């Protein structure tokens, strides 16, 4: 149903318009007649280019004349042209497109600036009297720009008093015939209209449109005027690198300083004078079309890059003011600069400065605001792809969504751009393009661009279609039209719209960070679909992000009425963006480790919930290789915060539970053990043996009942406090402060702890009854099977446990609370006692370190054991294929804790490796620097250190922890000694060997022959050596392979046959050189040749390599060498470095091609040689290069990995060069 205004007769409307502006009506009548002639003279789109070139050349010659006539003509005709903004709605799709064009002589001019129109609107409905309601996000800023000339004001003086309707400045086209042969698909078409067509419907539609627009402007601007700095906008032409015919240089808008005046805003030359444009004065009826002032104005329109996140990108439209005489700054728009006909876009190619207030105004897409909390999880799902244009989805109401078709994607209006050489519309849109400058080329004739909604990658396709355009429900909707010759009379409209469905999955009000700025141009029409990226895809390009401005959210409520849009995660085509470089969010951003870090390492930290779990950021190899790490994130101890319990309350409960166990242990010591020892000491006194020592021991044991009473009181207070607080803040620190004097019993016990233990051991030796008493207590259920020394250490251990628990508790308290200060005082009290323990006890520091490790490693039981000492800890990288994962190692003298770091700063135990059965080596691996291999009977670990010094330090500590009798056994076992294997109880073939890498052997490890193209490498599956084909012709069933036949070397074959017997007949191996089976008639018992072939051994055909004995004495991987490793060597006078394996043993330098070679290439006795380092110029430090001289003659130059390695090699060579 149309509104009452739409029912007014056309004659009445025309009379009103003429009455209000009689000059306009008369001029429009004449212009309409000219427009009809011009439409008839338009050429079809497929005509050649020569006509267009002639028109363009003629227009160029008239530039000076047009500019000279411009000012006078505008004064004579101040209201000759208007540009209106109206809705357009059409239910027709492709089949309705031709009739519409027939009725409407204007060409459809879809631009990217109209890509966010929410719906379509048909001409038929307007003609039938339906009045649409359109909300247009167009904001105008009066009062900014150059001062008005005397001809720049409206006749009625309302030029400065109409902030409701903006000025859309459009330069009219020439009245002559227009060549459409080369009409660009990206030029906004401008057609002409006769008076007879669509007159009535146009007036009605205009009234509805303008009234709707006026309502939107008033509501959005909140009665204020929005300033836009048009003075600081200039243009520049940016040609791309491709210097080809038809090349498309790009002209982008830039912001300049205040010194740039508006006269430099010209972009294209035309052959027509500048026209005035009419607007609606404030307070006048919307049906009365007024003339617009000629004052240069800018408009903020919402382009296609407006995203669902709630941030808009303004499309600034402005006109060149009269008197702009900088002809040299103008760019003639011809074939070579059709990158954006009439609409020049740029995505961050110039710095944007926002002058808009915070009253709900628009924000450019290149000035994206990211609301807190800073969360990039939703934009890090997939990398940027060239074929992923980001489009807009406009929110529809539930009623409108129910009327749509089954397809979840919105329909698109075809994109038909008509080129008008006289059009002088200047559009500044914040756009982006992912196309590189090398892809710039002429895009050919008019082209229709549409997005294939079935394409998963959202690559644009070429297709023509029309869509339904209706009044918009959101500020993202924009309907733009122009009337080139008419002002007060009815007019026809051409409307274009581009919709988007890609942003459906984005959460609301979360704008996307963009990548680096690039300029806009369009790819060739002949390229593939993924090159046809729309110009207005500014959702995945990086730009500089300014500080956030508040934006009203009430305007965008209808965009997110569908719950699926509001709750969805991220756009699948958005790329990851590192936001660490943006200064605006330095105080808000956090690393993933800091977000999940426990308050044990950072006090009073609130961790926000991350939208992307950490498991999503790990590689597939990491997830597959460490299932414990995935399960660790679901540890119940880590989920207390999610259950509503604070971390401080969890620590207090842990303190209570451990206190109960400690008090129970103290009761056994003070009652059972203390009483039994006192009775035994009385019997010793009766015997008269050293009463002084027994009295001292009795005094030391008297502290146990006092310590038990102290902790019994602490336990009762903790139970009462935690029972009363419930889920609130616990108060436990004052419990320790109230018993400050009683902790002196702990101090006295610690001071004489070592003395008491020594006296107890001596008394047990002197008194068998006391020794029996101690032994019975250790074996009883109260003793738990632990030694007396271990039980006594438990008493002191509790103080160190208090220290780590109170530290963690303190870090989870609010610094402003009273409990925070009390906890600091309690921690100071406990630290005084533990400091005494470190000073007086022999194992004080070691005990403290073991307590810290036990508290930090989850899954580890009691680390406190008699005789256990802490040696080293550190982080190494676990090597698994191409993946590298951090692993934290804790080395004690009897065990190695292999853990991986957790998010809260603690560690998850993966395995505990006994040091006694460990084999440690430093293998040389191609892609693993500073490798360290740890082998045990159960597992094999390959680790990588950060430096050679760190690797060597770990190797030294691990080797020192090995038992002396096991070191040589493990080292010999690594080098495949059968005798050592027997001593270690490792039978050949029962366990899979460690295969030698193929790059570590350049010759057979059995016979010493060199490997070549014909002599290939083969692994022995019994010992792991690399041997040649002649040395591996035998196979034997191995237990480690479930008795399957496997290739073994000759030495292992002999050993296996000697131990397990010959190969069973059913599994007997035929000669490799024979291609027919043993059951063949050729091998029958009656054949004379069978015995001959069977007697021939392949070893008889071996070519034994003649090797000097001096080169075969030492193997490359042999033990007992002073130093070994890879060095780069070059001969004197040459510059070519060659990487070789060098070994110094017995004052001889052996050179090998690889680390597992059996025979050396050469050997050099180092006696008499001198070593000199090569120092860098201007530096006294020794570099990685050093030289080997013999009698002042340069013999060799060597280059190590670093200076430390070079220093060790030089020291070893100097030692070997001296007798």
UniProtKB/Swiss-Prot annotation:
Its main location: cytoplasm. Residues 319-337, 631-644 have a biased composition (Basic and acidic residues). Residues 357-367, 586-599 have a biased composition (Low complexity). Residues 1-85, 94-113, 201-227, 310-367, 586-644 are annotated as: Disordered. Expressed in highly vascularized tissues, such as lung, kidney and ovary. InterPro entries: DBL_dom_sf, DH_dom, FYVE_RhoGEF_PH, PH-like_dom_sf, PH_domain, Znf_FYVE, Znf_FYVE-rel, Znf_RING/FYVE/PHD. It comes from the Eukaryota. A zinc finger (FYVE-type) spans 998-1057. CDD domains: PH2_FGD5_FGD6. Zn(2+) 2 binds at residues 1020, 1023, 1049, 1052. GO terms for molecular function: guanyl-nucleotide exchange factor activity; zinc ion binding. Keywords: Cell membrane, Cell projection, Cytoplasm, Cytoskeleton, Endoplasmic reticulum, Endosome, Golgi apparatus, Guanine-nucleotide releasing factor, Membrane, Metal-binding, Phosphoprotein, Repeat, Zinc, Zinc-finger. The keyword Cell membrane applies. Zn(2+) 1 binds at residues 1004, 1007, 1028, 1031. Pfam families: FYVE, PH, RhoGEF. It is found in: Cytoplasm, Cytoskeleton; Cell projection, Ruffle membrane; Endoplasmic reticulum; Golgi apparatus. SMART domains: FYVE, PH, RhoGEF. Residues 201-214, 346-356 have a biased composition (Polar residues). GO terms for cellular component: cytoskeleton; early endosome; endoplasmic reticulum; Golgi apparatus; ruffle membrane. Residues 23-50, 618-630 have a biased composition (Acidic residues). Residues 869-963, 1120-1218 form the PH domain. Residues 647-840 form the DH domain. PANTHER family: FACIOGENITAL DYSPLASIA PROTEIN, FYVE, RHOGEF AND PH DOMAIN-CONTAINING PROTEIN 5. Activates CDC42, a member of the Ras-like family of Rho- and Rac proteins, by exchanging bound GDP for free GTP. Mediates VEGF-induced CDC42 activation. May regulate proangiogenic action of VEGF in vascular endothelial cells, including network formation, directional movement and proliferation. May play a role in regulating the actin cytoskeleton and cell shape. This is FYVE, RhoGEF and PH domain-containing protein 5. It comes from Mus musculus (Mouse). The lineage of its organism: Eukaryota, Metazoa, Chordata, Craniata, Vertebrata.
